[in-house]
């Protein structure tokens, strides 16, 4: 038997004598720590996946993990022009190999421009400043910046 949304206290445990208690506190997005990351044109990928309203036509997705890949694919399928910015040397390094290849192929097929080895240094209202894989500073004009740089577990209950 699984019970969700239950307030658990000593009385509850004594009464029901569960074999196990699983505490699922959820997670919060990790926020990018660069100038401009709190701008109005910056959105969190998990929010965009729930509702893409307010996302412009030209989008930079920062991060190429599972959430970033899903977001890039979803936005490209909506006809958005998507650039994926990844500071690691390869796209999708954090994704299981069995899933990485089909996701990367899907992004290629949808026209997502993938920029591995590229580090975001600043976000402005007009786009993002990066250091590209060759070490050169570059400005990438976009309407919207979507951050997908990871999730941190909520531990307030511990």
Could you describe each region identified by the protein language model?
Residues 1-2, 103-112:
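Helical element adjacent to the flavin cofactor pocket in flavoenzyme catalytic cores
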Residues 2-20, 24-34, 38-41, 46-98, ...:
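Rossmann-like dinucleotide/flavin-binding elements
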């Amino acid at each position: 038997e699984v019970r969700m949304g239950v307030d658990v206290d000593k009385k509850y445990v004594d009464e029901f004598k569960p074999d196990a208690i699983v505490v699922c506190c959820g997670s919060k997005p990790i926020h990018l720590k660069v100038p401009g990351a709190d701008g109005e044109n910056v959105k969190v990928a998990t929010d965009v996946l729930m509702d893409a309203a307010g996302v412009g036509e030209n989008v930079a997705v920062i991060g190429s993990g599972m959430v970033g890949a899903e977001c890039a694919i979803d936005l490209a399928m909506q006809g958005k022009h998507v650039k994926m910015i990844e500071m690691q040397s390869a796209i999708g390094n954090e994704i299981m190999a069995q899933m990485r290849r089909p996701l990367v192929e899907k992004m290629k097929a949808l026209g997502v421009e993938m920029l591995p080895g590229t580090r975001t240094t600043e976000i402005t209202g007009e786009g993002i400043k990066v250091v590209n894989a060759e070490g050169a500073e570059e400005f990438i004009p976009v309407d919207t910046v979507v951050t997908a740089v990871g999730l941190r577990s909520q531990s307030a209950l511990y």
